[in-house]
Amino acid sequence: MSPAGGRVPPSLRLERQFLRAGHALVAGVDEVGRGSLAGPVSVGVLVVDAATRTAPTGLRDSKLLTPAAREALAPKVRRWAVASAVGHAEPGEIDAVGIVAALRLAGRRALAQLPVPPDLVILDGNHDWLSDPREPSLLDALDGLGDPAAGLPCPAPAVTTRVKADVTCAAVAGASVLAKTTRDALMTARHEEFPHYGWAGNKGYSAPDHLEALAAHGACPQHRRSWRLPGVAAAAGVPAPRSGPGDALVDVTSDTSSPRGA
């Protein structure tokens, strides 16, 4: 049975290979909110070590779980992990530096919350957006990235990328569940301030009710105004989104009507 189908549970096989190779702490990292029209992009990090036991029953990539299953798993995942955290980059930061640099910022904020930095990060996908860019960017000025006084990891831990790591690696799947449930809670809370957009249900993605509200009411401060928001004219004075490796992967047509919305 192919693990890509989600029917084979993720395991610690890859994490344990790295632990046996001499890494004391290995972290799984995954993001959520990349393709959303509103709200933050969020990055979860979950750390395991050689003593970490088998993952909680039912753990899967967050996109393969119902909201109720994710919520039930989240506290179990936190107790199972050696350490865990979720970091965010807000819409204004995404507009200022672009989605890839915003992912890096959110990931570094998550790593900065850990009591001890991991020796190695397993990052879902094939693009390393967590490590320092080859050239300085607006991100450096925005959040003091690279300055130890800013409380952010400097330098970033070693990173290895794995396609479908959120499906096959338990630490990454756990990170995806924590990132998703944390961001969902944030968007539900922000729904109270901006109820027109239906964020309690669509979580900021381009569901029909959100698109209808955008057409009727326009964008609010929680929207990513540098993006091409359906039915909304580009905001004056907002910089064009900065492009970078992986930016083309942004999907603003994500369907959150099923458990697969992330």
Curated annotation (Swiss-Prot):
- CDD domains xref list: RNase_HII_bacteria_HII_like
Catalyzed reaction equations: Endonucleolytic cleavage to 5'-phosphomonoester
Q: What SUPFAM superfamilies does the record point to?
A: Ribonuclease H-like
Stretches of Low complexity bias are at: 236-246
The UniProt entry, under Pfam families, shows: RNase_HII
Q: Which Gene3D superfamilies match?
A: Ribonuclease H-like superfamily/Ribonuclease H
Q: Where is this region: Disordered?
A: 236-262
Q: Which PROSITE patterns match?
A: RNASE_H_2 (PS51975)
Annotated RNase H type-2 domain residues: 24-243
- GO terms classed as biological process: DNA replication, removal of RNA primer; mismatch repair
What is this protein's name?
Ribonuclease HII
Identify the coding gene. rnhB
